[in-house]
Every structure is written in C-alpha cells, then in structure tokens.
Amino acid sequence: VNIAAALANFGATVVVIDLDPQGNASTALGIDHHGDIESIYDVVVGTTEFADTLRQSPENPLLWCSPSTLDLAGAEIELVSMAAREYRLQRSLERFLSSPPGAAVNYIIIDCPPSLGLLTVNAFVAAKEVMIPIQCEYYALEGVSQLVRNIDLVKGHLNPGLTLST
C-alpha cells in the first residue's frame, strides 16, 4: 500500500487489488469494504467486470482500489470447481486494460493473502512481477523458500513471463 501511495503521489495512476480476505489494503486506502459492495470477489467468481469494482481512494485521486470483502474468504472453495480457475483474475484484467479506463492505469499492485491457495495463484498468473515484502526475522523468512518454489511452478506452467524482483 505504501508503494502504491508513493507512486500515486509522484503522478502515476495506480490500482490496488485487495485479494486478501482480511481487507487490510482496502482499509489502509480508506475504502469501504463492508456490506454489499461490488468487490474483487465478484470479479474472481465471474459476476462483475473489474472496472465496476474500482473505488477511488479519498487520499489521492490517482489511487484506486478493488476492495476485498468477507465473501472472498470462501472464494477458494468456489474456485475449485470453476473452469480455468487459475486464469480468472488475469482474463478480467486483460479486458480492463484493453478498455479506455484501463489504458490510463500505470501500475496495478495486488495485495495477496499470506497463503499459497488459488487466490494467490490467480495473482501470480495475472502478474508480471512478484515482490515479497517481509520482515527480516526467522519466522518470516521460514516460508520464503516455499513461496519461491510456488512462484517457479507458476512460472513454469502458467505464466512464463513472471519475474521475482529483488
């Protein structure tokens, strides 16, 4: 979220996708993510187009968010039976980016849950680059090797253009 805010402060149009059911990125951006709003959940399950979920941050007119809602917590179970489940977010973003509002976006940042399920796989398939923000402590570093292995698997099978930034 801090990187998104900094980019927007320097004049870039930034979209944050809050793919974490806890919704902390939405909260940090001042976006309501309670109740019956259209959210990234609706995009992932295929009931809403991505552009319809975007909310402008009150902090900066160049900063937008596709918020999380509690519905996202059940999305992993719903995705299991869906066709092309790993590509749902990617396909929605491709449609958005080829439209006039999407063409104006400079950066899309996806905030992922701290798990390696289908929501995170959707993010990796949709992304061009992965950045792993972690604290330099033992428990935080413990899961990085598994995360890097999963990124390599996604790169090998689903998104060959995916890079891991340093």
Segments from the language model and where they lie:
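P-loop NTP-binding core
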Residues: 1-166
